[in-house]
Structure formats: C-alpha cells, structure tokens
C-alpha cells in the first residue's frame, strides 16, 4: 500500500475510536454480570470483535446496533462450554484475560489465535493461575497457544508478587480471584493500567487498591451497567505525534481517555518541549476524558525509563518516531516488554525507521535515537503489527519525494479501522 506523503500540515478535529483495553473489558464484565449492559463508543476493530465472538461462543447473548453493544449477562456460572476452540485472532488481551475468566469454570476450553499469538509467552499468566489451583497448559506442554484449560477446579486465594509489570497478567489473576475462595493479594512491580480494577467498582463489586497492592475477594457478583467508552489514548498518540512533527499542523482530539495510568506520552511531550494542551476534561460515566490539542513544535531529546514505561508501553513506537524529529539524543530504556508484543517492537522500530533515514540503535531494553534526521522514501513493513503500521504512516507524512510502500497495512484494522480515513480528513 502506498502511504500518504509530503502533506504540509494536518489541521482539524477528530474523535479517535473507543479505548481498546476498556472495550475488551466492557464485554467481559457485561458477560459475567447479571442483567443487561449497554456499551456506547465501543471499538469495533478486529481484536474487540474477537472478544464479542468468544463470549457468544460461551453462550452469552450480545446484540450489536449502530450505536450500541448490548450484553445480556449470565454471571460467571451462566457461561457454557463452547462447541469448539475459541479463536481470538490477534488479541493478546483476550487470550490472557479469558484464561483468568475460564480458569474457574466447570468445563474444558481450548483457546487459540493467529501466528502472532502462537509466539507470545503465556507462562506469565499460566504460572500464577496454576498456583491458584487452575489446570492449564500450552501446546505440547509448552507456554504457547493453543492453551487448554481443564475446568472443574476449585480456585484458592493467593498472595502474588508480580515479576513483570503487566496489566494483562494482573487482570487475569483478578478475574480468577473473583472465583476463588478468600481474599487474593497482588503486589505490582510497577503501576500498570487499572481499567479492570475501576470496572469492578463500576459494575458493583469491591476491590482495594493501595499503592502497588491490590486486594480482591472471591464470590462477588456484578450488575449490568450503561457505559460510554472514552477515546483510546494509544490511538490518539499517532495524531499527537503527527501534529507535533508535521509542519503547519494543529490537531484537536476530542473525548480522549485521560486515565493517569495511560497518559505517560503527555509527560514525554512536555519533557521534549512539545505543545500539548488538555481542555474540557470531565468524567463521562465515571471515566475521565477530555480534548487534547497539539501543534507543530520544536523538540529536544530526552531520557525515558523507569516507572513511566508501563504508562506508555504501547506508545513507544510512535514516541521513537517523535524522537527522530527532536534535536539531540533520546534514550528509551526499561522497555524489554516490547520484545514480546505482536512483534519485537524494539527491532521493528529501529529497522523500519532506519530504512527511512533515521539514526536508531536498538538495545536490550529499548532504543537510542539520534535526532534530528530527515526521513526519505522506502519500502517498509508493519510485520503484521498495528502500531508499527500506523507509526510508519505518520513517518511517511514527512517524506518530500518518492513513495513509501507499506507491506501488510491490514494490520491497522486490529485497533483503528478508520485510521487512514482520519489522516486524510485532516489534510489541508
């Protein structure tokens, strides 16, 4: 696919699609709640539609209208054995959280996905769930999908110190803990996104959060809710960077989710001297959201590492692009988690942006980016990773001559089906 290039400035306003993490979880909580849950501004992208498909296979009635998703909850005990394996496609969130949800059910389940999912590590979820009494294993006894979950297990409480900062692992344990006897205590290594914890409260449950420690009791029941999913800050990040680095730009992004566990990119933009303003912030059905305005800025290099990394882990590919247009060196560290995403994002970012003229050195846990460098035409690939594909389209906006050809552009539909249309809508 030929990407959009050499456009002088992006100007206008858009509303980015609903938050991917929250869209997944809204279906999950709607399913395990009693009664009806109505979800607006749901992300109708491949990953989240896969979560709907999985719960339909488990016997949950889910209606889809133009404006809403309506989930008729069954409670945990109303979930039924699927007729065959659950195919969750490309979604790491779905497979890992479903492992927690299904660990305590009274039937067996096999969960599988695409070739990317088959390469992603699942021991980080399986091992703590097995400590709670779950029985599950990967293909041929490995840690890789397909994952077989043997039901009819009685889950017990545990106290767990997380070895990695992962919201997916934490959420899988929480879902299992809701079905276990007693109170489970989780100690996070670093603070990660807390949508699962907030949704427990939104759906009428109880959970204690004190710094990095979480306490959750088993045997809880939930009640269906009405909710509006705010815009995904991870999707907004591509337009934030586009607005900062494309000459003559000013972009307004409306109804963007502002959960503090997700807004690390705002802090980085401020460190680098970028113009980013948040206005009209409000709580929509309990969720903090607002309008983000960015404009073309002169940027300087910075160092990114430590406890900010979980707050911007998904934005690092496009932050790396931002750094190529900043004066000086930017160092990103403590981000080894990028190696086990849809692809090895450390290598993918360095390889593809270097093809376009960037000066990036990959490291064991991050990237060293030397700026400022002009970018030129090249043939690039997304590696089947939505965030790499979208980052490369933003990079292409800076190319003045020649074409940028992207292999595997279809990956973008995993999280942002209208991405290329929204880019075109902002062209001067």
Curated annotation (Swiss-Prot):
Note the Gene3D superfamilies from the entry. Enolpyruvate transferase domain
Instruction: Tell me the GO BP annotations in alphabetical order.
Output: amino acid biosynthetic process; aromatic amino acid family biosynthetic process; chorismate biosynthetic process
Write the record's keywords in alphabetical order, separated by commas. Answer: Amino-acid biosynthesis, Aromatic amino acid biosynthesis, Cytoplasm, Transferase
Residues noted as binding phosphoenolpyruvate in the record, renumbered to the chain: 20, 92, 120, 168, 345, 387
Q: May I have one GO cellular component term?
A: cytoplasm
| Catalytic activities | 3-phosphoshikimate + phosphoenolpyruvate = 5-O-(1-carboxyvinyl)-3-phosphoshikimate + phosphate
Catalytic residues, per the record, are: 314
**Where would you say this protein principally sits, based on its record?**
cytoplasm
Q: Where in the cell is it found?
A: Cytoplasm
Q: What is its EC number?
A: 2.5.1.19
Q: Show the InterPro entries listed in the entry.
A: Enolpyruvate_Tfrase_dom, Enolpyruvate_Tfrase_sf, EPSP_synthase, EPSP_synthase_CS, RNA3'P_cycl/enolpyr_Trfase_a/b
| Pathway(s) this gene product operates in, as recorded in its UniProt entry | Metabolic intermediate biosynthesis; chorismate biosynthesis; chorismate from D-erythrose 4-phosphate and phosphoenolpyruvate: step 6/7
Listed GO MF terms:
3-phosphoshikimate 1-carboxyvinyltransferase activity
Residues where 3-phosphoshikimate binds: 20-21, 25, 166, 168, 314, 341
Matches recorded under NCBIfam families: aroA
What does the annotation say about its assembly with partners? Monomer.
Q: What HAMAP family does its record include?
A: EPSP_synth
Protein task: Catalyzes the transfer of the enolpyruvyl moiety of phosphoenolpyruvate (PEP) to the 5-hydroxyl of shikimate-3-phosphate (S3P) to produce enolpyruvyl shikimate-3-phosphate and inorganic phosphate.
Provide the family line: Belongs to the EPSP synthase family.
Q: What is this protein called?
A: 3-phosphoshikimate 1-carboxyvinyltransferase
Gene coding for it: aroA
């Amino acid at each position: 696919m030929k990407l959009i290039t050499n456009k002088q400035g992006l100007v206008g306003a858009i509303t980015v699609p609903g938050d991917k993490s929250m869209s997944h979880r809204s279906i999950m909580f709607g399913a395990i709640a009693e009664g009806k849950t109505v979800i607006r501004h749901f992300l109708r992208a491949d990953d989240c539609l896969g979560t709907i498909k999985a719960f339909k296979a488990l016997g949950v009635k889910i209606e889809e209208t133009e404006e809403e998703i309506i989930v008729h909850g069954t409670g945990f005990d109303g979930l039924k054995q699927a007729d065959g394996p659950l195919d969750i496609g490309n979604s790491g969130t779905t497979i890992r959280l479903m492992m927690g949800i299904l660990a305590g059910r009274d039937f067996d389940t096999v969960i599988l996905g695409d070739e990317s999912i088959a390469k992603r590590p699942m021991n980080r979820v399986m091992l703590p769930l097995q400590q709670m009494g779950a029985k599950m294993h990967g293909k041929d006894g490995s840690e890789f999908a397909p994952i077989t979950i043997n039901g009819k297990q009685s889950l017990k409480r545990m106290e767990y110190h997380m070895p990695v900062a992962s919201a997916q692992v934490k959420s899988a344990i929480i879902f299992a803990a809701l079905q276990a006897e007693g109170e489970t205590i989780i100690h996070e290594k670093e603070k990660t996104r807390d949508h699962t914890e907030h949704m427990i409260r939104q759906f009428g449950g109880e959970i204690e959060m004190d710094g990095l420690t979480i306490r959750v009791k088993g045997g809880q029941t939930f009640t269906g809710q009405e909710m509006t999913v705010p815009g995904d800050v991870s999707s907004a990040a591509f337009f934030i960077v586009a607005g900062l680095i494309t000459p003559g730009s000013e972009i307004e992004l409306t109804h963007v989710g502002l959960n503090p566990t997700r807004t690390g990119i705002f802090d980085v933009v401020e460190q680098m001297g970028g113009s980013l303003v948040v206005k009209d912030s409000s709580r929509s059905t309990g969720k903090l959201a607002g309008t983000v305005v960015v404009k073309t800025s002169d940027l300087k290099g910075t160092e990114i590492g430590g406890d900010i990394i979980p707050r911007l882990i998904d934005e690092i590919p496009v932050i790396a692009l931002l750094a190529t247009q900043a004066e000086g060196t930017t160092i990103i560290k403590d981000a080894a988690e990028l190696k086990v995403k849809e692809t090895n994002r450390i290598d993918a970012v360095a390889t593809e942006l270097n093809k376009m003229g960037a000066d990036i050195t990959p490291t064991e846990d991050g990237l060293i980016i030397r700026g400022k460098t002009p970018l030129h035409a090249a043939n690039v690939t997304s590696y089947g990773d939505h965030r790499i594909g979208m980052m490369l389209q933003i990079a292409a906006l800076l190319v003045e001559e020649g074409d940028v050809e992207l292999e595997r552009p279809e990956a973008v539909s995993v999280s942002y089906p209208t991405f290329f249309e929204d880019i075109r809508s902002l062209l001067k």
